Amino acid sequence: MIMMTRFAPSPTGYLHVGNVRTALICWLYTRSKQGRFLLRFDDTDLQRSKDDYRNEIANDLKWLQMDWDFDVRQSSRFDRYDEIFNYLLKEELIYPCYESKEELDFKRKMQLKLGLPPIYDRSALKLTQDEKNKYSEQDVYFRFKIDQSQLISWDDEIRGKVSFNAANISDPIVKRADGTYTYMLPSVIDDIDFDITHIVRGEDHISNTAIQIQMFNALRASVPTFSHLSLLYCDDNKISKRVGGFSIKDMQFYELEPMAINSYFAKIGTSDPIVVHTKIQDLIYNFDITKFNQAPTQFNIDDVIKLNPKVLHKMSFSDVKHRLSELNITSPDLWDFVSGNVQKFSDIQEWIKICGQSTVPVINESDQDFIKMALSVFPNGEINQDTWKTWVANIKEKTDRKSKDIFIPLRLALTGISTGPELAKLLPILGRAEIIRRLGYSSRC
């Protein structure tokens, strides 16, 4: 059997890091098993769901290097949901209810006041037909009837054996009074129709899983394998879309590389060390979902920021060739020169300026004679990365300066700043004419 997983975001906002982590782990899991990956948009909430959000979610996943085998919108499947809904209604596994929101809130408060679990009392099942006729169709909503005699259990790939006493579960609302579906039933129908074999999601869905297992059973369908990830926390607050959290847009504002994000989320919540990679495919090797633990997982944006320069340093010219071409950089020499000294990709623009002809050298008065001497012993012939070694040897024959007192004045003269990448790599980029111009700057002052 081919493994099939799905990532099912609701297009009512941007992806936050909790979503991204779930999507990544789900993607890595199925790709590690040569499985298929479904992107499902849970857009049954037609008022809040927006095409702009749907497009942004798809673009964000692509930016993170995640692909999918096919996608589906729940909003295109209402006829199918109606078909299954009517079947379950006929089987008396779904039943109509008539309470207002205010009545339900009152019942809940009274149950809590009496120390009872806030479970729906199934009063709608006790109504006579005459009593039902008093309500208009607009007042009717529907619940799925839980078999409360069962102990619902499953073997969770992260949490081990999980059990729920169905007597403590309230019959879930599956259809609202306005005719729209809640999350529960359409999700199960889709999982059945698209042959979903494994479901990876947050631990906040555990009680939903217990309910949905009964729905799978009611529809005589195979129950998928479940993995419930611990939730992400930032400063002891759960990260979610509604209460706020880092979105991919926030991460892009920080100019974080996709693989800094992926490398981080692939390992936090496990005991494995975080190792940076430049391609998402590298994270598939040896992926093991059982390594994720049950403890709350702390998210720290500073940790991702620290990974960013490490990812950039490991990137080859081919990894960034397209982005460099947008800056009119076609040679690998500049990237090889600066990649180990940038915190974010845009930092390269400063080095483009430094390597350009507009840079003003910095030559201290006390170093002017030294720079003139250094220029006089600059090697002839082709300039390559060995030129620096020869040049320094020539300089040391003419001065008793220590290495530090040689390197810093030369760096200031050649770049205008006191720190940066290896000068050996800079010389071929500048070329002889520009080197002579910069070193000869003091004589023109």
From Swiss-Prot:
A motif ('HIGH' region) lies at residues 9-19. A motif ('KMSKS' region) lies at residues 238-242. Keywords: Aminoacyl-tRNA synthetase, ATP-binding, Cytoplasm, Ligase, Nucleotide-binding, Protein biosynthesis. This is Glutamate--tRNA ligase 1. It is found in: Cytoplasm. GO terms for molecular function: ATP binding; glutamate-tRNA ligase activity; tRNA binding. Catalyzes the attachment of glutamate to tRNA(Glu) in a two-step reaction: glutamate is first activated by ATP to form Glu-AMP and then transferred to the acceptor end of tRNA(Glu). Monomer. Its EC number is 6.1.1.17. It catalyses: tRNA(Glu) + L-glutamate + ATP = L-glutamyl-tRNA(Glu) + AMP + diphosphate. SUPFAM superfamilies: An anticodon-binding domain of class I aminoacyl-tRNA synthetases, Nucleotidylyl transferase. Belongs to the class-I aminoacyl-tRNA synthetase family. Glutamate--tRNA ligase type 1 subfamily. Pfam families: Anticodon_2, tRNA-synt_1c. ATP binds at residue 241. GO terms for biological process: glutamyl-tRNA aminoacylation.
